[in-house]
Swiss-Prot record:
Its cofactor is Fe(2+). Keywords: Hydrolase, Iron, Metal-binding. Belongs to the GTP cyclohydrolase IV family. GO terms for molecular function: GTP cyclohydrolase I activity; GTP cyclohydrolase IV activity; iron ion binding. PANTHER family: GTP CYCLOHYDROLASE MPTA. Its EC number is 3.5.4.39. This is GTP cyclohydrolase MptA. The record marks C161 as: May be catalytically important. One of its GO terms (biological process) is tetrahydromethanopterin biosynthetic process. It is an enzyme of class 3 (hydrolase). Pfam families: GCHY-1. Homodimer.
């Protein structure tokens, strides 16, 4: 029995839709590495196309079908080295399957396992970062497809609040003065101890556009995020490691804004070879320990704009 193509019929309400597709779709993916073993990921996909006002629905099954075809092709034939390139492959296939679409978008997220060593006892453990990629394609009036791709990571760290630390330092100075300590002794005491403050679990995110002919290493992005907070977090810490991590974080207090700005500076320094119109997204979220709310800072810009601002500040 032949079924009618209900999706191709006209809708009752003729309004176009920006994004229609599927989310929370998981697939096993293998990515190639030069002279190293393959990376195995279990990413979650979000896949969308636009829908014209003249059509009732997209052919929904075609979107997961595209991912299945691309993933199988990678496993059997084609060599893909990055999650951003995987996203581009899917976008191009979406246009083939959804001939009515003028825009297509793919987002993927995956846990990424790394080896980490504790700072004092040198204990090895597995640490998890989240890696992500986005590809966005637009079909012009001539039928030519233009695709932009981005790659990024999300990393958890620790931050120490400078404000509370400064207040506790002032309280300590007042208390020591009342007990008869000289200003010189107070300075020596405070230089010898770690001043307390409250901490946050910081979540840093960096997304960078990958222009055609360029590469952006995810490992470099992960390092930038780690180095931009008060300190790193570790799955395995012995007592001496724990003391070291806490002390170092308190010696490097940072607001959520400080972390975001530090990431911006490091991105500009590390990826100085990228074209000036390269898009960059930086985001920091700090999970507060003494509040129910979270702290948030973000910048969405280009390499040129960020570099120009940094130059202005240093001149």
């Amino acid at each position: 029995m032949q079924c009618n193509d209900v999706q191709a019929t006209e809708p009752d309400i003729k309004v176009s839709l920006t994004r229609v597709g599927v989310t929370n779709l998981k697939k096993l993916v293998k990515l190639k590495r030069t002279n190293k073993r393959d990376i195995v990921l279990l990413p979650t996909f979000e896949v969308f196309v636009d829908l014209p006002s003249s059509q009732k629905g997209i052919h929904m099954s075609r979107s997961p079908e595209v991912i299945e075809e691309v993933v199988e092709n990678i496993l059997l034939e084609k060599e893909i080295y990055g999650v951003e390139d995987l996203s581009v492959e899917i976008v191009m296939k979406l246009f083939e399957k959804h001939e009515y679409a003028t825009r297509a978008e793919v987002m993927l997220y995956s846990d990424y396992m790394m080896e980490e060593t504790s700072p004092v006892t040198q204990k090895d453990s597995q640490e998890i970062a989240k890696i992500m990629a986005r590809a966005y394609g637009v079909k012009d009036d001539c039928g030519k497809i233009h695709v932009k791709k981005m790659v990024g990571a999300e990393v958890v760290g620790i931050t120490a609040c400078p404000c509370a630390q400064n207040m506790l330092k002032e309280n300590a100075v007042t208390s020591l003065k009342e007990k008869g300590f000289s200003s010189e002794d107070i300075e020596k005491i405070l230089d010898s101890v770690t001043i307390a403050t409250h901490n946050q679990r910081g979540i840093g995110t960096v997304m960078i556009e990958v222009p055609s002919g360029y590469t952006v290493g995810i490992s470099k992005i992960i390092k930038i995020i780690k180095d931009s907070m008060s300190g790193e977090v570790y799955e395995l810490l012995k007592r001496s490691d724990e003391a070291y991590v806490v002390e170092m974080a308190h010696k490097n207090p940072k607001f959520v804004e400080d972390c975001a700005r530090e990431m911006i500076k490091r991105v500009v320094d590390v990826f100085d070879y990228l074209p000036e119109d390269t898009q960059v997204l930086v985001r920091q979220v700090n999970k507060e320990s003494i509040h129910r709310h979270d702290a948030f800072a973000e910048r969405n810009s280009t390499i040129r704009e960020l570099r120009d601002e940094l130059k202005t500040l240093t001149n």
